């Protein structure tokens, strides 16, 4: 039994409780700061557009700042709050959010919902990127060219709320998975660059390479049509029969074989 299963059995043996977001969080609208308010240093801030372009799921520092005078007029998010973009050009991106894990308060722009709560911020943020939440947000979104979810309507969103210890264990598992995914992506990117380098080196024209048609270096033989191979031709062992599915799916588990006599006449 995994640690997560042990915690669930101990702390919520009758199942996880589901609650409305409005019952566990206070949801407010963002302020009215704009990109023209940005300055080199000052009060950290998040603009809703940056949630789509610059932030991942979590952040402990911002990319931009505003002056203290400007910040006095803005809406504030506190550590552990979640900032959600509620305006988007498409339904898939709407309600993308970032958990603020920094130590200070931050100013937040309009077109956002600030979710203040006492749960595990990373757990809620992971949940807000699940298919379960996506199904609910689709019902709340409205608009044509620009999609919007009114912050007040987020109160009705249903959220599974296990005990905090369970939330923490779930976050640990998802963090590890995210890290492994990032490492795999980096490895694949490096391999792709390596492949492209060698491909370019091989194909680059030089005095040591020549170009030939595929027909000059390969022999092509048409495979037999279905009528050429019948069940009575198959044997339990011998020469493997290569099927279309092997080429399509890359699965080389051979089902059929023919003996040497049949192989020689094909």
Predicted regions mapped to residue ranges:
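Short, structured motif recognition centered on aromatic/hydrophobic residues
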Residues: 16-21, 43, 77, 81-83, ...
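A short beta-sheet element
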Residues: 47, 62, 68-131, 243-245, ...
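Non-catalytic DNA-recognition/assembly elements of restriction-modification systems
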Residues: 8-31, 204-225
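Amphipathic alpha-helical segments
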Residues: 15-17, 155-192, 196, 209
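Short, solvent-exposed loop/turn positions at domain surfaces
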Residues: 10, 32-33, 70-71, 101, ...
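Structural preference for solvent-exposed beta-strand-turn elements
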Residues: 150, 163, 201, 207-210
């Amino acid at each position: 039994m995994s640690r997560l299963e042990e915690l669930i059995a101990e702390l919520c043996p009758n199942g996880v409780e589901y609650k409305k977001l409005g019952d566990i969080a206070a949801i407010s609208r963002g302020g009215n700061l704009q990109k023209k308010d940005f300055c080199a240093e000052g009060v950290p801030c998040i603009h809703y557009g940056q949630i789509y372009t610059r932030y991942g799921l979590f952040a402990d520092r911002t990319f931009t700042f505003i002056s203290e005078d400007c910040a006095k007029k803005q809406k504030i998010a506190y550590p552990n709050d979640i900032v959600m973009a509620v305006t988007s050009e498409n339904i898939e991106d709407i309600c993308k959010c970032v958990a603020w894990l920094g130590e200070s308060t931050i100013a937040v722009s309009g077109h956002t919902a600030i979710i203040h709560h006492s749960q595990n911020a990373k757990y809620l943020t992971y949940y807000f990127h699940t298919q379960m939440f996506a199904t609910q947000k689709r019902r709340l979104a409205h608009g044509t060219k620009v999609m919007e979810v009114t912050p007040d309507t987020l109160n009705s969103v249903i959220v599974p709320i296990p005990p905090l210890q369970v939330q923490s264990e779930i976050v640990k598992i998802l963090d590890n998975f995210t890290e492994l995914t990032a490492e795999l992506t980096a490895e694949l990117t490096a391999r792709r660059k390596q492949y492209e380098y060698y491909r370019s080196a091989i194909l680059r024209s030089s005095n040591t390479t020549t170009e030939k048609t595929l027909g000059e270096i390969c022999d092509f033989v048409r495979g037999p049509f279905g009528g050429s191979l019948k069940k009575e031709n198959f044997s339990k062992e011998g020469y493997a029969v290569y099927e279309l599915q092997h080429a399509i799916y890359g699965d080389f588990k051979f089902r059929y074989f023919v003996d040497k006599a049949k192989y020689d006449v094909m």
